[in-house]
């Protein structure tokens, strides 16, 4: 099973999300920055690497938020792991997306997210009242 890691980066009450480019898989869908874990790589290390590649930042992972399995039609199951990133060196730059956007948490459901992220978005937005630090 492929493991995919994603970063929830919040600043000033907004969350950083990226929109995929039009020519690849799942064109123009929104997602949290991150990517696939390579063989023999730990998930946290993969996320640090992916954030450097996609955003040009050196991130410090604060902890895992949640994980679950998902299967896109006709594809193998994947394990999605979402991490909270509270600090990073550098200013996020768009090195890999069609566009980057800082979005208020309550506005996330209005974006056309990857199917694999939709349940997390609902859960994350619903947590605000119960767990304001996540």
Regions found by a protein language model. Name each.
Residues 14-53, 57:
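Conserved Nudix-box catalytic region and its N-terminal flanking loop in Nudix hydrolases
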Residues 84, 93-124:
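NUDIX/MutT-family hydrolases
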Residues 1-16, 36:
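Conserved N-terminal beta-strand and adjoining loop/helix that marks the start
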Residues 7-8, 22, 72, 91-94:
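Short secondary-structure boundary/capping segments
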Residues 125-134:
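Generic C-terminal helix-cap and adjacent flexible tail
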Residues 2, 58-59, 68-91, 101, ...:
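Active-site-adjacent beta-strand/loop module that shapes the phosphate/pyrophosphate-binding cleft
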């Amino acid at each position: 099973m492929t493991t995919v890691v994603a970063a929830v980066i919040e600043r000033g009450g907004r969350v950083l999300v990226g929109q995929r480019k039009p020519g690849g898989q799942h064109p123009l869908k929104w997602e949290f920055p991150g990517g696939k874990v390579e063989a023999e790589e730990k998930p946290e290390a993969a996320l640090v690497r992916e954030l450097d590649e996609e955003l040009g930042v050196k991130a410090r992972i604060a902890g895992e938020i949640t994980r679950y399995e998902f299967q896109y039609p006709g594809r193998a199951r994947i394990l999605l792991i979402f991490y909270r990133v509270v600090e990073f060196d550098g200013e996020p730059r768009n090195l890999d997306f069609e566009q980057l956007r800082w979005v208020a948490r309550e506005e996330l459901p209005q974006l056309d997210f990857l199917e694999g992220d939709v349940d997390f978005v609902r859960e994350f937005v619903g947590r605000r009242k119960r767990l304001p630090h996540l």
